[in-house]
């Protein structure tokens, strides 16, 4: 399972559904990140493994 962590220009990503979703594959997470990056306030998105501690997978930027 994977999740997305967004770096925002101002505000938080709590109102964006893609930031709350859990993704079964990296490809699905990349697709969710692409949708998240369409939001003007999102600067970059980090894909992490949904485990404790979270493990970094990759960065996606504009």
What kind of region is each of these model predictions?
Residues 1-19, 50:
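Short aromatic-glycine-(Arg/Gly/Cys) micro-motifs in beta-strand/loop hairpins
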Residues 11, 28, 52-54:
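Generic "edge-of-domain/loop-turn" microfeature
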Residues 8, 26-29, 62:
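A generic structural signal for solvent-exposed, polar alpha-helical segments
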Residues 13-15, 22-46:
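A short, charged, amphipathic alpha-helix used as a generic interaction element across diverse proteins
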Residues 2-6, 34, 58:
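Intrinsic-disorder/low-complexity peptide segments enriched for small residues
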Residues 15-24, 56-62:
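Surface-exposed flexible segments
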Residues 37-62:
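Short, mixed-charge low-complexity intrinsically disordered segments
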